Amino acid sequence: MNKKSNKDSVVAFGGAGWFHIIYMLLMFWFYVGMINDGSNNIAGNIAEAMGTTAGNISNCNAIAGVLGVIIFLIVGVVNRKIGARMMSGINCIIAGITYMGVLNAPNTVVYTIMMAITCGTIMSAGYLCGGVLVANWFPKKKGIVMGYTTMGHNLATAAFV
């Protein structure tokens, strides 16, 4: 009896493999929802709640994005020391907590700080930790798996916009 090889399969990853794929897809979903599209969608409502303009909130988002990249670099160093699995969980939790701070910020300073932390941590969860998880879990099918996981970007845009 010939066993069928999954060498050429693009779906035979097993339950644990699909769990990882969906987990990483959701990290990208939240990244787009919190940062890329989400920050533009909430700017008007946040500005109204703070008594400022949407343009000011967009400026805060730009500053937060630059600060988020700095956080991203710091998390990269920590990621190498304690591992991608632990860091992805830590980053997702921090991003969720600080996003609540974004939505409830009393002024633009608090908003910018919370958005910077949210940006840096959710970006780190998806790109730094997620990339390492894919490389470790799917050493021979990284490209196919990254194709599935990055669908989170497009699905989030379709849902949020």
Regions found by a protein language model. Give the residues of each.
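Primarily marks hydrophobic transmembrane alpha-helices of the MFS/SLC 12-helix fold
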Residues: R85-S88
